Amino acid sequence: MVEAKNIIVVIPVYNCHRYLSDAVTSVLNQPCKGIQIILVDDGSIDGSSELCDTLSAQHETISVIHQKNSGVSAARNAGIEYALSLCQGQEEASYLAFLDADDAWTSNFFDASVLDAMMQGYDLIGFLSCGCNISMTKRNEPTLLQEGIYTGGSSSIWIHASQPFCAMLYSCKLLSTYHLRFQTDLHYTEDKLFSMSALYLAHRILLQNKLMYLYRQNAASAMHTRCHGIPYFAPIIHGYLMVDKNMAPFQNSQREELVAGRQLACIYVMDMADEHFSHFGTLKAFNRFMQENVDSEELSALLNGEDSRIPANAAYQQLQQHPVAYVMKAYLKGVLLAFPRLCVKISLVKTLRDARRFPIAMNESTMEE
């Protein structure tokens, strides 16, 4: 039987003193009492470390791990290891969730219906998430899932495109059996690679249109989140190529070979090209990446359609055939985007953009409409 103690939440903490109490309170206030919380302080220097200890002293269900600053992936991995030690011998009945320190759960989420779902023994249970403004007084409309029961494997990988990593419950048995952990050498999309691996390895997956997760979005910075060019995209592309290789040993009659990582790597190469050129990067720098990158030969073959399962990338072929025209078009796009990028920094524009982006008012004290 699933009990509250079989639910474990890992919260990585790094310089998030302003929001940490809200995140923890959103778990403590759930109808299901006794949920175990693991706070992993990743070398915070803003008072978050001390706050973790204070919260732990106040609530017996809260444990704290202090470590030197090693990144969010290492913090989550430390939380996973500790969580598995807590549920040793009860992995089949235990579930792990992840909550970022500046986000929150909706109130009344962990009710009897969620506990009933957990008792069915699913490897993964996915729910809804939505973005909120900084004060968490307004939110947007979540994208609905195709509710139902799914079998893991390559056909289920694309669930991750609309299923945020944090709005899922992960069976501790799944994490333990396959030693699922986060890649510590990645600073972006490490959560996507983790969820892709989990979806591939899971046997049974349940998706429900029940709102679980609220994440803060800074509308002013949204237009700049991918404005990092080649240094930003290179590790992401490498990570997606690696996930296919990492899952290859688990291929069997029930799991087809995973190619989603390679497909996504191709998409991200062209996203990288668009970001690079629209911010007036040079063709020479892009070509250097394609020639000198550790994955260059594999990427070129994939983009040119040499793998029959992955169609040739039309945009890449256009770039190869008409490089000057492609780059000039991207430069023009960059010029057209320059004005909106400046405007979004204006306070009034931020307010108007927030109002449009987060139309649904919430009760701040209960995290509900």
Q: What residue ranges belong to the model's regions?
A:
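Short beta-strand/loop segment that forms part of the nucleotide-sugar
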Residues: 34-43, 63-68, 101
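Short aromatic/hydrophobic "clamp" motif used to bind/position activated sugar donors
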Residues: 96
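A conserved acidic beta->alpha catalytic loop
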Residues: 41-51, 70-71
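Short, well-formed alpha-helical segments that are part of the catalytic scaffolds
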Residues: 15-29
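Catalytic core of nucleotide-sugar-dependent glycosyltransferases
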Residues: 212-218, 225-255, 268-298
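Donor-binding/catalytic cores of nucleotide-activated saccharide
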Residues: 101-208, 213-231, 267
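Glycine-rich, basic loop-to-helix element that forms the pyrophosphate-binding segment
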Residues: 67-89
